[in-house]
Amino acid sequence: MYGLLRNLLFRLPPERAHNVALGSLDVAQKLGILNTFTRQPEPCPVNVMGLEFPNPVGLAAGLDKNADHIDALGALGFGFIEVGTVTPLAQPGNPKPRMFRLPEHQAIINRMGFNNEGLEHLITNVRHRRYRGVLGINVGKNKDTPNEQSEQDYRKGIAAVYPYADYITVNVSSPNTPGLRDLQFGDSLKQLLHAIKEEQAACEQKHGRYVPVAVKIAPDMDEQGIRFVAAALLEAGLDGVIATNTTISREAVKGHVHEQEAGGLSGAPVREASVKVIQGLYAELGDRLPIIGVGGITDGDSAAEKIRAGAKLVQIYTGFIYRGPSLINEAVEAIRKEIS
């Protein structure tokens, strides 16, 4: 069924297809017929970051940037949903076209640029959701905010979403906001992590509950970079790390018509790089800091591979676009076998 729907959607421009698909999900959910086309996975509970997840397969940030579709997506069987990336102020993102399919590689190149409606819009949607599963909210900085002032945007984001999130992700790894990835390294990272923990502590005191904070990193790191990030996360006392975001490498798609398009490459070509980063992080972190693995999950084996590499949870996005909801069940069952 999904294969037929995907073939129809793939006749549309990628961003248009994205919006049509999510709108159709909303309609099906409101009509109460969504479960007719999907099968809920059997429970596979895990406890990570002090949170109980019904299963370890979540939806990665980026699909539902504004939290417009939480209820429909939450009905598909995900163990958790992550919305965003949201910035303090609404921004249009980069000029179109800014998303490109590479079906031969089960991949997508995007240079969206944190297009979103801002914190107020997202929070309104989150407050009115019916979905009561685990919800992560991914926060970023506005494009016009200089890196030296970026901590102000992250503080605003954390403070605003704190009352509504089960966990918060700080995105410092999108390749589509100029200079953003510079925040992953050196004193910039250490200073940002310090500010994040300060804001988290202030919010905990204000709201009387502890909301874990994770940082999302890029796959384009060498061993030295991975060791530095791991040490900085431990030193600051972060609660988790999401590995990884999209890659700027085109090695795996050389010769493709879209090879030279600027932006982040996601999907199957990121699988190997993501696993290497997870392995490197786990070698440094062990079980002291949980890893959420994302990047290149297109079937059960690639999901279980992330767990073998050291991840406690996984997230899907591009694979979900190519495979549909059946990927959720397949990934859950593969991970169940891996951890049993």
Curated annotation (Swiss-Prot):
Keyword Disulfide bond: no
Role played: Catalyzes the conversion of dihydroorotate to orotate with quinone as electron acceptor.
Keyword Flavoprotein listed: yes
Residues of the active site: S174
Example GO BP: 'de novo' UMP biosynthetic process
Binding residues annotated for substrate, in chain numbering: K65, N110, R111, M112, G113, F114, N171, N176, N245, T246
Membrane topology, as annotated: Peripheral membrane protein
Gene Ontology, cellular component aspect: cytoplasm; plasma membrane
Protein name: Dihydroorotate dehydrogenase (quinone)
Subunit structure: Monomer.
Record text on cofactor binding: Binds 1 FMN per subunit.
